[in-house]
Design a protein with these regions (language model features):
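Short gly/pro/ser/thr-enriched loop/turn and capping motifs at secondary-structure boundaries
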Residues: 45-48, 110, 129-134, 200-202
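Accessory alpha-helical/coil subdomains and C-terminal extensions
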Residues: 103-105, 111, 115, 122, ...
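N-terminal phosphate-binding or glycine-rich loops at protein starts, especially the Walker A/P-loop
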Residues: 2-49
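Glycine-rich oxoanion-binding loops at beta->alpha junctions
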Residues: 1-2, 48-103, 109, 141-153
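Gly-rich Lys/Arg/Thr-decorated short loops/hinges at beta-loop-alpha junctions or inter-strand turns
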Residues: 7-10, 64-76, 128-138, 163-165, ...
């Protein structure tokens, strides 16, 4: 039985995530193993509009499995949000003979893929985002690496915190989702974790937790803040203000964990 699909495209869009290159490699080699041609679309949906494509075979994805970022590059594309932009992208798909498209990215990438599917293009979305905010999957590509990287950074920070008896506020990415902050907070044993899914009261969810930890004998504290919940700097300043009245022997810093980019747009 012959394949109905003979030629597909693959693109990465939005913020890059660890593991995207490994995913590109898997798509290309799986397609080639089934006799399906594969083309790479560079710079996401912008490349689909402008026709920025490259033929891909097994050799073109050799030795990229451990590389960070994405060899196909990524870019935001406001034009694709418009009907005219989507029509241009569809025209490119027909011009280069695509029977299907594989889109790797987060929620914005998936929205773009859904819009394109309305033109009759077969689309597969592969969740690649550190935010871990895509339904129907336990983990998205890049989430585990981002979580472990943040934990490694905070473990190193803790050594200094213990030496100086400090309270540190660490803001991590996640866009409007608190998965990354929550997983990291649990892994490092944070005193408090603030996530956008739940509103918080500073006195109840931060100050009181620090107070109880202090009474139990702890001399250093770490507060993890998801970027969608609050500003890490603002929380740190509020802790400093409280410290002037209650904890004059505790210092407060604010460290921004390494940022990888999110997938808000197409």
């Amino acid at each position: 039985m012959k394949n109905a699909v003979k030629r597909i495209g693959v693109l990465t869009s939005g913020g890059d995530a660890p593991g995207m290159n490994a995913c590109i490699r898997a798509v290309v080699r799986s397609a080639n193993a089934r006799g399906i041609e594969c083309v790479g679309i560079r710079r996401g949906y912008q490349g689909l509009i402008s026709g920025d494509i490259v033929e891909m075979d097994n050799a073109s994805v050799s030795r990229i499995i451990n590389r960070g970022g994405t060899i196909l590059y990524s870019a935001r594309c406001d034009e694709f949000r418009t009907k005219e932009g989507q029509e241009k992208a569809y025209a490119t798909c027909k011009l280069i003979g695509l029977d299907g498209l594989v889109a790797i990215g987060g929620d914005g990438t998936f929205r773009g893929a859904q819009d394109l599917s309305k033109f009759g293009i077969s689309v597969v979305g592969i969740p690649g985002t550190i935010d871990n905010d895509i339904v129907c999957t336990d983990y998205t590509i890049g989430f585990d690496t981002a979580a472990n990287t943040a934990v490694e950074c905070m473990d190193k920070l803790r050594d200094t915190m213990q030496s100086h008896e400090r309270c540190s506020v660490v803001e991590v990415m996640g866009h409007r989702a608190g998965y990354l902050a929550l997983y990291v907070g649990v892994a490092i044993g944070a005193t408090a974790v603030l996530v956008p899914e739940r509103s918080y009261d500073f006195e109840k969810h931060v100050a009181e937790k620090i107070r109880r930890a202090r009474i139990s004998g702890k001399t250093n504290f770490m507060i993890v803040v998801a970027e969608g919940a609050a500003s890490g700097m603002a929380v740190g300043e509020q802790i400093k203000k409280e410290n002037m009245e209650r904890y004059d022997d505790i210092h407060s810093d604010c460290l921004l964990a390494p940022k990888y980019g999110n997938d808000e747009g197409y």
